Structure formats: structure tokens, C-alpha cells
Amino acid sequence: NGSGKSTTAKLTTGVLKPTTGSVTRKPGLRIGYVPQKLTIDWTLPLTVERLMTLTGRYSASEIAAALEAVGAARLHKAAVQELSGGEFQRVLFARAMIRKPDLLVLDEPVQGVDFSGEVALYELVRQIRDTTQSGILMISHDLHVVMAETDTVICLNGHVCCRGTPSAVKRSPEYLRLFGERAASTLAIYQHHHDHEHHDDGCVVAEGHAHEHDHGGHSHG
């Protein structure tokens, strides 16, 4: 905590402006954002359908399609105040994906969700990665998920300590100083869920062949 993860997400989306340096985005880049916290006046009546239109004008069919894509179709008329933690997060995913983003920024997307809900939401992230062309920047402090479900890791501690493939990062001196040998040895047993392996230079080997790898990108801060 306090390493700059959420600040990085907000700088990426433009929610915050840098006080020094600069952030460059491709012109016309569409960004979907699932914040760590969303401030809502819970005393006001608010349906999921209405929440989906607070930041843009979308048709009923667009809203229905976005909710369907994240497994939340039945919630479109539900009161936001009555949603479980996992249901609310799915709605936030739908709210982010309705813009058909080029880049999806997820800031601790499973915070406040129970274990089974976490598993389901990480499966949803994997589904989005595999079925859309969106790049994904996921902010997380869960090292097991970071190492098992990513292509590129960026490790922050007030600055960029190290970056690269999971296998390269967990061997880096900066990572070992930050988390210790015990963490590195524990994480060494993780199983990557892709049907390929990453070389340290980012090249991918699958079924005995090396090829360039691009499924929209998937990075962790």
C-alpha cells in the first residue's frame, strides 16, 4: 500500500494530471475504468440501468448487451444499494466495457469481494482479455494472481522497481529486496494459465514455435 498503484491508474485514465513529467496517450484512445472505490450517495434511489448512463448516453440495447457480457443481465432493473459486492463489481465492469475501450484499467477490481467472488471476477478478466481486443492494466497487490495471470509485470514502490515477464521480475534483485527470497520461492510454483510460455524478452513460445504475442496486452502494476 502507498506505492503509487492507484495514482498510476488515475494518471493513465486522466483522472489525475501529473505534477511533473507527462503522460502521453494515443489520440482517440478509449479507456474503460473500474475504480478501487466509487463514491455513491446510497440514500438516493439508483438502479443499475441508471448507473450505466451517468457517464454517457447509451441505448437500452447497449446497456443490456454490456450487462450480458459480464454475466449481470438480470440486474439491469435492480437497485444498486441491494447488490452484493461481486454483483456491484460486475456492474462496474459492464459500465467500463460499454464504451468498447481500447484499454481497460482495473484498480484492485476484487477489493471487498469474498473469495468465491474473487475467483469469478478474475475469470471475467480472463474472458475479457481473451474475447476482446482491449489491453488490460490491472492494479493489484495479490502477487499470486499477478504472477499467474499476466504478460508484463510492473512492480512499484514509489517508483518503478522492476518490470518484465513474471519469470524475469521474480528473479530481479529489486523484487527480491522488496519481497524477499521466501516470496520468490513461494511464487515459483505458480502455473501460468496460457497455452504458451514467455521468454524474458517478451517473445512467446507455443507448441514448439516462437511468435509475436498480442491478445490486447495484459499488464499489472
Regions from the language model: what does each represent?
Residues 60-75:
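Conserved ABC ATPase "signature" region
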Residues 79-83, 87:
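Conserved ABC ATPase signature
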Residues 100:
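Conserved catalytic motifs of ABC-family nucleotide-binding domains
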Residues 104-108:
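Catalytic Walker B motif of ABC-type/P-loop ATPase nucleotide-binding domains
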Residues 140-141:
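H-loop/switch region of ABC-family ATPase nucleotide-binding domains
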Residues 153-165:
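H-loop (His-switch) and adjacent beta-strand-loop-beta switch element
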Residues 171, 178-221:
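ABC ATPase nucleotide-binding domains
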